[in-house]
Amino acid sequence: MPDKAASKKISLFFVLALLTAPVWPDVLIENVRVWDGTSDALTDTTSVLVRGNLIAATGMDLEAEGADRIDGQGRVLMPGLIDSHVHLTHAFVLGGVKALEASTWEEIAAGAVAAAHEMLMNGFTTVRDMGGMGTGIKRRIDEGLLVGPRIYSAGAYITQTSGHGDFRLRSQPNARWAGREMSNLERLNVMRIADGVPDMLAAVRENFAEGAAYIKIHAGGGVSSERDPLHVLQYTPQELKAANQAVRNWDTYWTVHAYDPKSINQALDAGAQCIDHAQLIDEKTMKRLVKEGIFLSSNLAAMSEDLFRHPLYGNTASPVHVKARAYVNRSSEFADLVRKHQPKYVFNSDIVFSTRSFYRQHMDYEKYVAGKWFGNLFALKGLTSRGGELAAMTGQHNPYPDKLGVIEQGALADLLLVDGNPLEDLSAIGAHSGWFDAPERDADIKSIRLIMKDGQIYKNTL
């Protein structure tokens, strides 16, 4: 027989839990023109009602008894921004991969917390962390203990031995062959070296076990790493197909780090649904991306000659400099191919190994280049609705299943209120034409007057 006294205690516990759960009033944002994340024009003056963490309604004459009211004073209300390629654990590590390997977990975590706060103050209410970070900080942000964007985490890098994500120092042999302990970054689950089908399956499943929303695999050579030349094709078709099967079993997707046609096409043949970088792509492969509906996540500022003003890439004695020079020289056709074929581009900042000041300059310049090369509307969609579409590719494994990157009924209430019209001038969201020569600024962007994430206001300077 059930214990009636115990049942009453349990019932009382749940009632008290409901009574003490955080409750905040509805918010009615009035007198605004809305850019909804997809349209090519602003609405006429209207209102948006937020209830809980969702957009409840849009339009004039909304019923909102008891709601907190915000007068937008004719400003533009738009979706919160989405950065589809960040590395929060690497953002404020100075000195590159070697410095990261030498870092303690406290140093890495502290940098990631600072980077998360920085992203939210830059208007990014959602980020896709592309490797090197688990879900601990994500969970603490979701719980309200830390301030930052919602995070879609890929978990640890998955890399082959001597792949782009193999961040071991030259003095550190492979633990498997040497019978020694793993490197610091392996031990901290920043990277996983996986060779062969069994290792690949185990690495994918381990990332999911630790909370990854999707999987990121290094499928080709990189610039910032020292063990792999830029031209190298990484992993075999069998290994990538095994990863694809493991990922699909979780009803989510996987993306790859890949620059050139051979690495991109091998990944697509195996089932990848997103390509990150791709700056060395050819026209035939670009057409394939468009035909198959593949997402393209590309960082643009890195194709500039200004890249060599960065201390890591400008050091002519470094092997990283040699690879960066080859990369910049060979990426000249990329922008023309994107303009011509209009792939499913999402915004990608990929800012690593920087100071706070440089982080802000780089982010502002990345926004500017996206608009300059592709037009403001194309860039803004990549920063909002298209980023939301990519987030939704996580399917039943989506940690935030409501719609992102748009202003419509039922979507998550991630909103920015800005001075100016971003469709005409991206400086409304902080874009700046200078990179290293840009003036230093504070953490927040002055033209972004209000930042709301998940229905809660994190900045209001009205």
Positions of PLM-derived features:
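Active-site core of metal-dependent hydrolases
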Residues: 154, 161, 217-333, 346-354, ...
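Histidine-rich, glycine-flanked metal-binding segment
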Residues: 38-78
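Histidine/acidic-residue-rich catalytic or RNA/ligand-binding cores of hydrolases
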Residues: 92-95, 139, 225-226, 264-270, ...
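C-terminal cap of metal-dependent C-N hydrolases
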Residues: 32, 397, 403, 407-462
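His/Asp/Glu-enriched, well-ordered alpha-helical/loop segment
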Residues: 249, 330-422
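Histidine/acidic-residue-rich, glycine-tolerant segments that coordinate divalent metal ions
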Residues: 133, 142-266
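Metal-associated gating/positioning segment near the N- to mid-region
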Residues: 75-143, 161-168, 238, 270
